[in-house]
Amino acid sequence: TEPFILFLPRYIGLQPEDQRAIEILLDAAEHIGNWSGVIEDWYDYQRDAFHSFQIGSKVVRKETRDLYELGEHFRFILMALAAHRVSGEQRYLDWSIRYGRKRAERILLREEIPLLWDLSGNPVDEAEIQRLGIQSLANSQHHKLGNPLGGIENLLSSGAVYAFGDLYRLSGDQIFKSAARQIVAPLVGTLSDPYNEPAAAALSYYRSTFSDESLDSEILLQIESFPTNPPDELALLFPQIYAIREGGVGKRADMVRWGEWTEDGIIKPIQEPSPATFTLAFQVTGNPLYAERALKNASTRLMM
């Protein structure tokens, strides 16, 4: 799905006269709501859910292990909205609002966001995922076992907060704001995590898109715990063994690590918050020192 939600919409924005690019995007998007008429249906309008996780232009696989709704299905909202922007066809927007509203309702049904849902909208917990052997559907390779933010990470990685933001702007329906807040509110407690870029970025987006500063007092408490000064020198580390070693969001087994190089040649785990976190701190406080620290932090990492 990445070419259709990341590359093509941006490319078409730069090259709006490229009809071939538009045709490719619309050719994919027409399957989302069963509009093509030449392949098996992807979407179940009775349950407002996709028929499967494994769907394509040739096969819609309906084996038992495929009958779940994941964070990845949010990507079809982003694709349909992109199709609406380039074509002006109302069906793409209507479907996006309909499906987005149903996903929002399911998110709001319980306090903790599950790793995935069955096709009737029931959450599937981690113990059941282990029993069924469907860890790959839950993206278990990207979060530690028992991580309470695992479900949120799955939604972040598929752009759920950004999809809800688009739907809120287009419809004004408060349910999209409520669902987005349900996703981002638990992330405030991760702001001191040096690897939490997706969390800080989502909080920043939520705060501006929904004009909601209700989390600011909690964010300020986190900011107060930040190190007073940045490290003198960073170190870039490549662990020998690929593994998820921390909780929270934004971790990969194969990611590089950052360390703080001390004068005596010892490398300590980095304590400096991420550039995205300092950007959020600047937005909340208006203190330009946080903006300066974000830019310096980011430029140093890019240089390395």
Please provide the spans of the model-predicted regions.
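Glycan-recognition and catalytic cores of secretory/periplasmic carbohydrate-active enzymes
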Residues: 1-304
